[in-house]
């Protein structure tokens, strides 16, 4: 109350300004108009600060208790949970999607009041309840599918990779391959939802809002389309030449010459030329149809704010070179969550799993996309990608387990010239395991690393996959199925014997 404010001395005013983190000149401005009966000196203060202010015993100062969300798990889960605004309404993340469920409903009642006031406050005195119109309803609890252990593990591994390679950012998503539940979804850099006004561009959940050309992670799908139509088989030989192939006046490059290789090795060595030559044999409508079956060009249905569908142009608008480039993941774009969901097909004998972020939501039905036989062939090819002998992602290997996956390395597009940068890349890896009975699917993307420190998907994202999967297999007690199986069994037996002693 500006009219009643009365400082005993200058020191008292100085102490108040200090506690409110205001300059004295700004405090004076707020209190200048003595006709204003209610002046807000500070919107939010901590409870201990309020106590110190009230201990000053300055006449005319009062406070109101305000309940505000506090997020103890901030950085790693900030993009998933989101935050509420000053009005208590959800602004981002699950807070926004489930705001109505979390908030509950206010009640309404009619009271009898008189025109007297109590304790000097401008609040009418209630002398009796007349009628209750609507009872209040408490908000409901929401349980997410997120496993905080894996969320933190993924965040820390991602942070390490981004910092090591001096990249702009990184994102990761981990799915339960059998249920489609999102076990981890994180980005780095992140932000603190308790101070979201300082988040800037990093406030977006880039797993669902940002698109990029997926690159070579599309090769297993385009090759699966050709296998399904019996255009080629896994042993069909493809001449990839000396690492450069001119098609429709454009050069298609491989990182090195691979010569004549079988279809199954096109994925292992990630040959753009091999993928392009295989795609020449399949119609655009069949290739586009297969991509759509895998979920590209539409939202996943995760129901998260800002999710985009990505771009998969109509096949009727593809030129021959567009058809070729789409086979190895250029000329289209997708989100991380789309691609991760797509690879649930390879983990489930050809069925695409619907994904979810909230426990207890209505279960959706899986969709048949590939035959079990073709899926098995592709899964074998994906496992070869992690081979030490010629695979593009040996760094994704997990001790004691057979894992499979595909690397992706794509150039970034200059938003001004619409041309590709020659020194800016996006590196990604989509992996699943264990191969004998896939339990997890995970995709990692590292954006704009320092090229001198390595920019391929296998180098950037492979180690993140390996680190997180090692913990996931351990925490979920997944049986080992790798070549080191006997060694692991022996170690467990030795450990058990020591415990007996």
Predicted regions and their residues:
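Short, gly/Ser/Thr-rich active-site loops of penicillin-recognizing serine hydrolases
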Residues: 366, 462-501
